[in-house]
């Protein structure tokens, strides 16, 4: 006598998927979700990088959501002019705000320290506050973490009323929610050794 166990299959559809990988891995994942016909949000933290919206294409529209410090369709902020000037000068898209913050804050810390000595600059960075163009950005003194506002945005067709595209495509980012810098502060256990 052979006994067969036939468990009942339970098929569920998740309410969302989270994926943290850069470009090619994420693009393959997002396309697979689209091709499978899963109508779920796909959250990631790298979809805004140059080349990704173009590679994802229609598979990401209304589905891919990313966390970022800025995107071009945030109207009314000084970064819009910076964005347009960058495109005019370099003939390519720009969307990676941490680069701008790093350069601006580092230059300001050198000026504040009155020197390029790494120790002097490191101390000048501690507690440094800066208008990042979409809100205050600051360097937490305890662990040198950059605290800044974040946006959760969804990839949409520009025909849905978006002013700017991403990657010179027909797709752009549309804000779902802004998370203020104060809401991004998490406790830490860092104990930096200072010179």
Enumerate the language-model features and the residues they cover:
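Extracellular/periplasmic Venus flytrap/periplasmic-binding protein
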Residues: 1-37, 72-81
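Active-site lining segments that contact anionic ligands and/or coordinate catalytic metals
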Residues: 14, 39, 61, 134, ...
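Active-site-proximal beta-strand/loop segments in catalytic clefts of secreted hydrolases
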Residues: 19-23, 45-48, 67-71, 143, ...
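A bilobed periplasmic-binding-protein/Venus flytrap-type ligand-binding module shared by bacterial periplasmic
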Residues: 106-109, 154-156
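Short, well-structured alpha-helical segments that form the helix of a local strand-helix-strand
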Residues: 117-134
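Solvent-exposed, acidic/polar segments of extracytosolic/periplasmic ligand-binding ectodomains
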Residues: 129, 133-195
């Amino acid at each position: 006598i052979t006994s067969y166990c036939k468990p009942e299959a339970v098929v569920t559809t998740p309410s969302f998927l989270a994926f943290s990988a850069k470009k090619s891995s994420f693009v393959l994942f997002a396309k697979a979700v689209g091709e499978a016909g899963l109508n779920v949000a796909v959250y990631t933290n790298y979809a805004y990088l140059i080349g990704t919206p173009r590679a994802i294409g229609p598979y990401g529209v209304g589905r891919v959501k990313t966390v970022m410090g800025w995107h071009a369709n945030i109207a009314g902020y000084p970064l819009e002019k910076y964005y347009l000037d960058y495109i005019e000068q370099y003939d390519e898209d720009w969307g990676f705000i941490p680069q701008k913050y790093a350069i601006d804050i580092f230059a300001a810390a050198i000026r504040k320290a009155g020197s390029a000595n790494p120790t002097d600059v490191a101390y000048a960075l501690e507690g440094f506050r800066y208008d990042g163009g979409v809100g205050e950005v600051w360097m937490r003194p305890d662990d040198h973490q950059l605290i800044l506002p974040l946006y959760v945005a969804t990839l949409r067709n520009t025909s849905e009323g978006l002013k700017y595209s991403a990657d010179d495509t027909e797709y752009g980012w549309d804000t779902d929610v802004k998370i203020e810098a104060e809401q991004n502060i998490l406790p830490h256990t860092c104990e930096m050794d200072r010179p």
